[in-house]
Amino acid sequence: MNKIGEYIGLLIKNSGNRQAAVARDIGISRQLLNYIVTGKRDLSLQLALKIESYFNLPDGQLYKMQAEEVIQNYKQARKAILFKSLKEEKAFWSYKDVSIKNLSDEDFIENTFIYLDMNMISMLFEIYQRDFIKKVWREKIVVQGE
C-alpha cells in the first residue's frame, strides 16, 4: 500500500494540474514524480519540502506520513513472521478460521509467549508497547492467587 503516493496524486488531481506541470513547477522530472505517486520511489526530505511548499502544506507533513507508513509496514511484516511461526507450531489448533486479521492482540501476545522462543518473543516489543505486553502477561500468563 502506498498512502503517501496516493495522497500526493490526490493533491495533484484536486489542484487541477497534471503531473507534468507540477513536476516542472517544483523542478523535478515527470518520471520521478510519477515514481513517487505510484510508490516506486520514496520521498527525499528535499522533495517532500518542495511538494509541501507547492501545495501549501505544513513543513514535514509528507515526510512524517511516509515515516509512519514505513513503521506500519515494518510492524505488519514482523507480525506476519510471528503469525507464520505460531501456525507452524500449531498454536491455533482450537481456533476456527484464524487469520492475522481476526486474532486479537491479546491472543496474539499470549500465544507468542506460550509457543515461541525468546528471539520471537522479543519481536513483540517491536510491534506493541511494553506496558501493553506486560498487561497481557499479567492477565493471561502469570498464575494469580492460589
At which residue positions do the language-model features occur?
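Recognition helix of helix-turn-helix/homeodomain-like DNA-binding domains
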Residues: 28-43
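Short, charged recognition helix plus adjacent turn
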Residues: 63-92
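Residue-level signal for the short linker/turn that defines the boundary of a DNA-recognition helix
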Residues: 16-18, 46
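A short, Lys/Arg-rich alpha-helix, primarily the initiator
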Residues: 1-16
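Short alpha-helical "recognition helix" segments of helix-turn-helix
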Residues: 19-24, 33, 51
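Mid-protein regulatory/catalytic core that forms ligand/cofactor-binding pockets
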Residues: 89, 101-146
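DNA major-groove recognition helix of helix-turn-helix/homeodomain DNA-binding modules
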Residues: 46-61
